[in-house]
Amino acid sequence: MHTLVDLLIHTDTRQSAILVPEDGTEIGYGSLSDQVDRLAARLRHSGLDPGQVVAIALPNGIEYLVAFLTATRARLIAAPMNPTYKAEAFRFFLEDFAARIVMTTSVADAVREATRALSLPVWTASRNATGDVQLSGPGGSASTKDTPDAPVPGDIALLMHTSGTTGRPKAMPLTHANVTASVCHIAAHYQLSPADTGLVVMPLFHGHGLIGATLSALFAGARIVLPDRFSAHAFWPLVRAHTVTWYSAVPTIHQILLARAASDNADSLHRRSYASLA
């Protein structure tokens, strides 16, 4: 795998890719790939040029993954942001990213306040009951035959910020080659395969949640269960209901789950990851 476009190409299109446990919505790899191609054409025909930055302020869900993969498919740079930021924080990160547009929900008041102050276009992400994502925003229209040229390994795919614990947060660019190398290594190390089901408990704006838990599973052709947030109370019921074989999290989450293990009648998983990537 050389770019994030390759993430979906090798996978059986009939295989289940993402399940949202809150409402039971499930999409396969074929649907995911088709949506990304269609929406990538829409983005590029809106007037954006390769290498420009698309900020993403969305909660965990199908919408987030489609938005992220769409941006990178269109040779744009995805810049994830914590969707719970206040308007002041959004404004700082949007300016620092030099974002050209923002993808968010219809009810994201703080990010919309920041975009108004910066005169940035907003694209609203939504989906229907079958998992089809729509991106509504300014610009032209296009069909899948207008799919833009694929990215190359040296293109920047992702902009993330350091935590800022020792000073001002700094933007950290990652190329398609950087991201795919990490994804391939993680999938190989944990021997992930289409037989696996992963439970995503980390936020997707976090490198660990996006790269370590999610993209690595998709590269392996595995299925992911994607709740909108981590819930210790819901963890083991989800594991049992969906035959989860692995998850990846920071140590704090492991500690929370271990503390509840006896009372929750905890089962065992085949694999688990402890290292945070960002």
Where would I find each of the regions flagged by the language model?
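ATP-dependent adenylate-forming carboxylate-activation enzymes
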Residues: 58, 79-94, 106-110, 222-242, ...
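Conserved AMP-binding/adenylate-forming
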Residues: 25, 41-88, 97
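Adenylate-forming
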Residues: 59, 104-110, 202, 230, ...
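Conserved AMP-binding/adenylation subdomain of ANL enzymes
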Residues: 180-197, 205-245, 256, 260-265
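AMP-dependent adenylate-forming
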Residues: 5-28
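Conserved pre-ATP/AMP-binding loop-to-beta segment of ANL
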Residues: 13-14, 129, 141-161, 168, ...
